[in-house]
A protein has these predicted regions:
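Aromatic-residue-lined binding/catalytic grooves and analogous aromatic/hydrophobic interfacial grooves
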Residues: 1-172
Length: 172
């Protein structure tokens, strides 16, 4: 497979591959309603392949061939320090987060599950279940506006909680 970053931003964006064969997308938020965009971001993706090969096919695309398995580690940093200060370094923040991944996938996943479940398991929501719940998720999403799917509403509620828990932990 091939991996590269794409973005809806039309300007202020640079895609590249580092010397360590990590994908990088850096940019700055667009101006909006006459206000200059000041938040800068850098996204890094480290690809670890088990078997096969990893090679750069362009200045912004990595290709994995004949691998038994592949793990993608994604790290995103911004220059946001607080609402009055955007003096941080997006690249060094993203690099710091990526360097902290020093476990294999199974250990990283287990640590993540342990960390979020102590908050996540405090709440449950049961809005009922009907035949919609037996359909594939992509079908349920497409049909949601025209069908009654209380279990999907509960699932979205829990998904939102999961994202909030994971994105609001100390240190990142």
């Amino acid at each position: 497979f091939r991996s590269k970053y794409t973005t809806p931003y039309k300007s202020n964006v640079v895609r590249s591959i580092s010397s360590r064969k990590e994908l990088q997308l850096s940019g700055k938020a667009n101006d909006h309603e006459g206000i200059e965009g000041k938040v800068e971001f850098t996204a890094l993706t480290r690809i670890e392949n088990n078997g096969g090969s990893l090679e750069a096919t362009s200045d912004s695309t990595l290709q994995v061939k004949n691998a038994n398995s592949v793990t993608l580690y994604v790290s995103i940093g911004t220059n946001f320090v607080n609402y009055k200060d955007v003096s941080g370094n997006a690249l060094s923040t993203a690099q710091k987060y990526l360097k902290q991944v020093n476990k294999n996938y199974a250990k990283s996943k287990a640590a993540h599950i342990n960390a979020y479940q102590k908050y996540f398991n405090r709440v449950s929501l049961d809005l009922g279940r009907n035949a919609q719940a037996d359909k594939p998720t992509d079908v349920r999403v497409k049909e949601f506006s025209t069908s009654f799917d209380p279990q999907m509403a509960a699932l979205y509620f829990q998904f939102g909680r999961y994202l909030l828990i994971c994105s609001s932990q100390p240190g990142g």
